[in-house]
Amino acid sequence: MAQVHCNLFSYSLGYPVDIEVILPSFTSCNMDMPHTHALPGKFPVIYLLHGYGNDYQAWLRYTSIERYAEEHRIAVVTFSCHNKAYLNAPLGENFYDFLNSELSEFVENYFPISANPQERYIAGLSMGGYGALLHGLTNLERYSAIGAFSPGIPDENPKEELNKIMRIDLYKVTREALASGKQLPDLFMCIGDKDFLYERVTRYHKTFMPKWHNSRYRYDDLPNYEHEFAIWDKEIQVFLDWIRRKDVYKQMGKNKV
């Protein structure tokens, strides 16, 4: 596994940003095999979003995402969003624009990462789950699947506290995506029944699950989990097994790590 840290100036943000790129590579179990000398193709990729109060390191430190990515032969990209909910903010901090275009421009040009939307996925936890839903549903042809782990979903009440951070209404965005008639990304959501966001996520699920069309939808309601990395470490593995893939690395089967 290659883990690459990048610090680059962002034209969307107006200052440098930290990015971590995980690239599958060979292990002691497949040392000196042909594909370790010449890649059979570009890697599929998951853009993995952190939650409120975290940064690009959270998924790397508190889950085994690096090992899971190696096993599934898939690249992972993380970056720091500074509690801005993956939205454009005042004073030029355009995190929506950064994730929507600049980040993929960089990694797809500098690394062996696929630019094929069918090999591009987006997922996140908490605030990052909100970001994954927002970006996946406002760019219907950009991602093959969305993973929303205990997502921060504000109520439709405009005075609700979460709306101060997550300013774009996910209910409105989702209704517009459904009304577009376009193919929707596959959607994976999960929540623990002890999570403080449980009622919000359950309400969103019950509102839109029956209306999801032409795509797969999975909802995991797990007992005895709160808002914690224990559930996210568990469910990211399920998500990696669940997403639809036709790339050459999927055909090679799981890697032994």
What are the functions of these language-model segments?
Residues M1-V257:
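Non-catalytic cap/lid and distal C-terminal segments of serine-dependent acyl enzymes
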